């Protein structure tokens, strides 16, 4: 049996140590990482993966695209897929900055906690202009939720919403939430609230969500205090607070890691797997 080889194409200068560790834990026998990968130089790397093994042996080679910039990762991922033709292809996965696995885990846990459906309900993503927030908005909208993607500046929030709508064929709206007052206003009438902001910034004080009767579930992706949502713990995984449930970053992170490992394992099950947000989310729902 051929060794399971994972080639890590990273858009940053140095390939992610985190992704290497999870890659091995997911079943790879050997990982080779390349930094500063772009759509212009990735072709030669892809050729090395698709022309070296034949038949069933080809499924023992796989590609992982990562790095800190999701937009750059998406461009590289598209270039990788365009290089494939006929049987000359290997399985590939996109998870720049952990965005796909993190968002998939968070949304899957919330949907499960909501009874399996969020259709027709309102979901607000605060500080949603980054890759995790955008992916979360996309997955929630794909589940039929009415999604509002919020940012400090309306033009940036609108650009993020437009990007999500174009990529995922959904209808996410944008809102400006520059301060505590506007964020508290934005979550009024919402059933679900996600916070995807930078480290060290509380986006939603405890009173703003605990006193809003419509809110059923809150979820925060920031593990470092102060958390994005006041009054919860990073380890919360569906913990109840006055009839509402909360998910903290570490509560979500357990599934995120299991999901990442499971995706790596699946890369080696065939030579035709493509794991982007939709495919990763499908697996997350099975695992949640």
UniProtKB/Swiss-Prot annotation:
Molecular function (Gene Ontology), one example: methylenetetrahydrofolate dehydrogenase (NADP+) activity
Keyword Nuclease included in the entry's annotation: no
Binding site for NADP(+): 129-132, 152-156, 195-198, 256
Coiled-coil annotated spans: none
Any one GO CC term of the record: cytoplasm
Subcellular location: Cytoplasm
Temperature dependence: Optimum temperature is 45 degrees Celsius.
Main subcellular localisation: cytoplasm
Pathway it works in: One-carbon metabolism; formaldehyde degradation; formate from formaldehyde (H(4)MPT route): step 2/5
Alphabetical UniProt keywords: Cytoplasm, NADP, One-carbon metabolism, Oxidoreductase
Assigned EC number: 1.5.1.-, 1.5.1.5
A biological process term (GO) from this entry: one-carbon metabolic process
Catalysed reactions listed for this entry: 5,10-methylenetetrahydromethanopterin + NADP(+) = 5,10-methenyl-5,6,7,8-tetrahydromethanopterin + NADPH; (6R)-5,10-methylene-5,6,7,8-tetrahydrofolate + NADP(+) = (6R)-5,10-methenyltetrahydrofolate + NADPH
Stored InterPro entries: Aminoacid_DH-like_N_sf (IPR046346), Methyl-teptahyd_DH_N (IPR015259), Methyl-teptahyd_DH_N_sf (IPR037089), NAD(P)-bd_dom_sf (IPR036291), NAD-bd_H4MPT_DH (IPR035015)
Keyword Isomerase set for record: no
pH effect on activity, per entry: Optimum pH is 6.0.
Subunit structure: Homotrimer.
Purpose: Catalyzes the dehydrogenation of methylene-H(4)MPT. Can also catalyze the reversible dehydrogenation of methylene-H(4)F with 20-fold lower catalytic efficiency.
Protein's name in the database: Bifunctional protein MdtA
Species annotation: Methylorubrum extorquens (strain ATCC 14718 / DSM 1338 / JCM 2805 / NCIMB 9133 / AM1)
């Amino acid at each position: 049996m051929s060794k399971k080889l994972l080639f890590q194409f990273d858009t940053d200068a140095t390939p992610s140590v985190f992704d290497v560790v999870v890659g091995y834990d997911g079943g790879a026998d050997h990982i080779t990482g390349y930094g500063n990968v772009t759509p212009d130089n990735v072709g030669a790397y892809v050729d090395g993966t698709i022309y070296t093994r034949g038949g069933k042996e080809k499924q023992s080679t796989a590609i992982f695209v990562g790095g800190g910039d999701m937009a750059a990762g998406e461009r590289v991922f598209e270039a990788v897929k365009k290089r494939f033709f006929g049987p000359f292809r290997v399985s590939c996965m996109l998870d720049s900055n952990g965005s796909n696995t993190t968002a998939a885990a968070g949304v899957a846990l919330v949907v499960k906690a909501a009874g399996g459906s969020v259709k027709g309900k309102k979901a607000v993503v605060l500080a949603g202009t980054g890759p995790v927030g955008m992916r979360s908005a996309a997955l929630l909208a794909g589940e039929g939720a009415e999604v509002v993607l919020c940012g400090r500046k309306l033009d940036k929030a609108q650009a993020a919403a437009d990007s999500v709508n174009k990529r995922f064929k959904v209808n996410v709206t944008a809102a400006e939430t520059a301060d505590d007052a506007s964020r508290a206003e934005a979550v009024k009438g919402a059933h679900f609230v996600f916070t995807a902001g930078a480290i060290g910034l509380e986006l939603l004080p405890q009173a703003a969500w605990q006193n809003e009767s419509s809110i059923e579930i809150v979820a925060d992706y920031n593990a470092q205090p102060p958390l994005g949502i006041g009054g919860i713990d990073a380890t919360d995984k569906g913990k109840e607070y006055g009839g509402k449930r909360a998910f903290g970053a570490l509560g979500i992170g357990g599934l995120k890691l299991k999901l990442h490992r499971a995706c790596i394992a699946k890369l080696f099950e065939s030579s035709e797997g493509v794991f982007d947000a939709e495919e990763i989310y499908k697996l997350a729902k099975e695992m949640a």
